[in-house]
Amino acid sequence: MVQLNQNFIDTITQELPAHLSMDEFIAACDRPLRRSIRVNTLKISSDDFKTLMQPKGWTFDPIPWCEDGFWISYDEEEQLGNALEHIQGLFYIQEASSMLPPTALFTPSAFTTSAKWQYVLDLASAPGSKTTQMAALMQNQGLLVANEYSASRVKVLHANVLRMGASHCALTHFDGRVFGEYLYESFDAVLIDAPCGGEGTVRKDADALKHWSLDDVLAISETQKALIESAFLALKPGGSLVYSTCTLNRLENQGVCEYLKQVYGDAVQFESLSDLFDGAERATTAEGFLHVWPQIYDSEGFFVAKLTKTASVPRLQPEPKLQKNFPFTTASAKQAQGIKDYFQQDLGISLPDELIMVRDDEFWLFPHEFNAFIGRMRFQRIGIKLADNSKHGFKVRHEAIIALAGKQLSPTAKTVDVSDVEAKEYLMGRDIPLATAGKAQGEVIVCYGGAPLGMAKHLGNKLKNNLPRDLVKDKVLLLPEQTKSL
């Protein structure tokens, strides 16, 4: 049974729209969430994914605000995070409401068009559902800066970015309040899914509202105001900003947006989201925001606001000095050709036309757009690590295979396709015996269902597992095909 704090009920009763009832709200909070996923179109189309999973008993109910999002029905009780297809990065387990902010940001408006965006900021990124959704919407073009304040959550963010093959991300680890200072008016679009009271999450956390207090709401709303102001300062004139939370009270939602409007006046232009998808008007506020109560779409509670920055605004701090000692240098023509030849000739992968950078004996691939940010802020991780170079030659990195061995793979690539059982063994760190012994082939790409799993060394009679130790799984779930009853 869900625990609803009486103080919360008293407060939210005053804010609930007249056409909604408190009884329906409480009943919705007590129902379990429908299971939802988003297909990762960086690796597979939604149609192909449905074709892949329907024989395994999945049914797909489209989420109206996300073209690649679906509520799914599935008979098994196993954790889908262990599913082979999830480990491959073919889908992300993501609550339906949380797919709203990226959709709102990337929907062209009368003011902006996302087609011209080169620089996008996700101010509070972890665990990465919205970051990877935006990476898919950008189709790994431009630069997506993903920031996370919590050190432990940066690791989770990085793991999800790699799993989903998002190669144009640069990860940072800062308090979001510094971006307006360090990267003033640098981004075409900014998403801030702000830390919040989490009132909308009660359907998956029955105790989320057990200790609710107005004092806590007031305190966190002050942090949210500072974050949205920083995000607004980091936004270019003419750019779009989406502010979202998974909470329901006005102080953390409309109140934060109204604060920004009070401070910056006509430079803040609210945009209506009433036409974002069929039925959006059921959750649209007078200002044009989406205030999603759980009973409206049978989802988590959520809030989404979109605005355009119509004019430049003064910066609050002097421009910081450029930071020195950037550890990467641009690869020489000889170095760049060497790494390209290795990928093409040894692996069958054509490297995209991006910046090849070198740090010591490491070769990296950066988005061209990152050049504009060198020295302006410290980055935890940029682009993808391609390979290490030693006296024995290049050694490809796992993340490069995951990010690049899909669409860039040539017919001559050295690949070995494995069965689902063999794929499970591989992901659990085990060597794969080969049914027929043959000539050793050296480094090969291990694939399942046409998608890469990682690297192995072909020894003739077996594949020696080269999966990084930190990616070895204790459990891999093979979803069985369902037999049809007569």
UniProtKB/Swiss-Prot annotation:
GO terms for biological process: rRNA base methylation. It is an enzyme of class 2 (transferase). Keywords: Cytoplasm, Methyltransferase, RNA-binding, rRNA processing, S-adenosyl-L-methionine, Transferase. One of its GO terms (cellular component) is cytoplasm. It catalyses: cytidine(1407) in 16S rRNA + S-adenosyl-L-methionine = 5-methylcytidine(1407) in 16S rRNA + S-adenosyl-L-homocysteine + H(+). Its EC number is 2.1.1.178. One of its GO terms (molecular function) is RNA binding. Specifically methylates the cytosine at position 1407 (m5C1407) of 16S rRNA. NCBIfam families: nop2p, PRK11933.1. Belongs to the class I-like SAM-binding methyltransferase superfamily. RsmB/NOP family. This is Ribosomal RNA small subunit methyltransferase F. It comes from Shewanella baltica (strain OS185).
